[in-house]
Each structure stands twice: as structure tokens, then as C-alpha cells.
Design a protein with these regions (language model features):
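General secondary-structure edge motif
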Residues: 31, 38, 54-55, 78, ...
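Short, aromatic-enriched amphipathic alpha-helices that serve as compact interaction elements
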Residues: 47-67
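Glycine-rich, flexible loop segments associated with nucleotide phosphate handling
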Residues: 62-65, 69-79, 149-159
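A beta-strand edge to alpha-helix "cap/lid" segment located at domain peripheries
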Residues: 2-13, 17, 22-39, 107-118, ...
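A solvent-exposed, acidic/Ser-Thr-rich amphipathic alpha-helical stretch
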Residues: 64, 71-136
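Alpha-helical interaction segments
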Residues: 47-49, 91, 152, 163
Length: 194
């Protein structure tokens, strides 16, 4: 096995011996078969990367929002001021009370673990349609298990997807409309314990 080369041979860099495009040359085609501007492609990549980071921040905050050091106004770094959320547990509009809305759901469990994947981002100027898969594991609180008529077991899991729209703001990309769609569950959820 060859060690990793910091500078691959020219044949690898330029596609196996084909001539590498000149700097500034238009090299890719858009969906309609026309040529795309390299700067637009770069801007699109940067926007997609920023939105992917937004998704990652949100996914991490779902699990860490109640940990010491997390700013109580964390939703401002994720959502627009007029955001609209539609979840199986309820709906919320605007930033006011949004942290408490998320926290109330999380406090039903002693811990949560969210995993996201397959981030589909479709740019439309200063807006973007987003969809990604989510698997969330929720660890029931010991007192919840003791109080239940029938022990729900240690875990409640949910698989589904988030879908919504993001908007470019003065502070960067933020979710403007956001919803979660359940595809499957495993275990007993809080609604079945109340």
C-alpha cells in the first residue's frame, strides 16, 4: 500500500492523464445542460455547507440544549424570528418561547441522542428547501418508568425526517419553517404514558 501523497501525480490530479482545465474555464453543466459559472457553483457549495452546518448545530442542540454553557437563547442561532414549527408534540410560531418548547419535550427523558443523515438541500436564491433523515433515541427517566402502569422499558426511538425551508438572514442561514414527520417508532412514547 502506498502512503498518502500530499501532492498526487499529475495524472491523478487532472483525471488520469486528460488535460486539466485552464483556470477560470467553465467545466460543469447545470441541470438544463448549459454551462454553470464557476463562481455560482462555488457560492452554491458554500451555501450548502452553511446549511449543512445549521442542520448539524440543530441536531447537536436537540441533545445538549439543557447542558451548562448552552445559551438560553440558542434558537436565535437556528431559526428566523418568524419561524413556524410543526411537530407531532405540537406547533410553535416565532422565537419567543421556542427554547422552552424544545426543552419541555427533552425534559421528559433523562437523555436523548439524535442522528441525522441524507441532507437534501435545494437552493433557491436566498431560500432553500431542506429534508433530512433523523433517528432519535430517548432514554426514559427512572421515575417515569416507576410511575407507569406498565414499564415502558429503557428506550423510546423514533425514525423519520425533518423538512422545511431555510432563509438567508443578516446572521446567516436560519430555519424559517420546520416540521418533523414520523415514519416509525419503537418502544413506548410519552403520549402513551400520560
Amino acid at each position: 500500500m502506498r502512503p498518502y501523497a500530499a501532492h498526487p501525480p499529475a495524472a491523478v490530479r487532472d483525471g488520469g492523464g486528460e488535460r486539466a482545465p485552464e483556470a477560470g474555464a467553465m467545466t460543469s453543466t447545470g441541470a438544463a445542460g448549459g454551462t454553470a459559472r464557476p463562481q455560482q457553483e462555488l457560492d452554491d457549495l458554500l451555501d450548502r455547507a452553511a446549511i449543512a452546518r445549521l442542520i448539524d448545530r440543530y441536531t447537536l442542540l436537540l441533545d445538549s440544549q439543557d447542558e451548562p454553557g448552552t445559551a438560553p437563547d440558542w434558537p436565535r442561532s437556528i431559526f428566523t424570528h418568524d419561524c413556524r414549527l410543526v411537530f407531532p408534540i405540537g406547533e410553535h410560531h416565532g422565537l419567543a418561547g421556542l427554547g422552552a418548547f424544545h426543552d419541555a419535550a427533552k425534559q421528559k427523558f433523562s437523555a436523548t441522542h439524535h442522528l441525522s443523515s441524507n441532507h437534501a438541500i435545494v437552493l433557491d436564491g436566498d431560500r432553500a428547501d431542506i429534508r433530512f433523515q433523523m433517528i432519535a433515541t430517548h432514554v426514559h427517566r427512572p421515575d417515569t418508568r416507576r410511575r407507569a402502569a406498565r414499564d415502558p422499558g429503557p428506550l423510546f426511538q423514533v425514525g423519520g425526517y425533518y423538512a422545511g425551508r431555510a432563509a438567508r438572514t443578516a446572521d446567516g442561514w436560519r430555519f424559517a419553517s420546520w416540521s418533523f414527520h414520523v415514519v416509525w417508532t419503537s418502544g413506548t412514547g410519552p403520549a402513551d404514558l400520560d
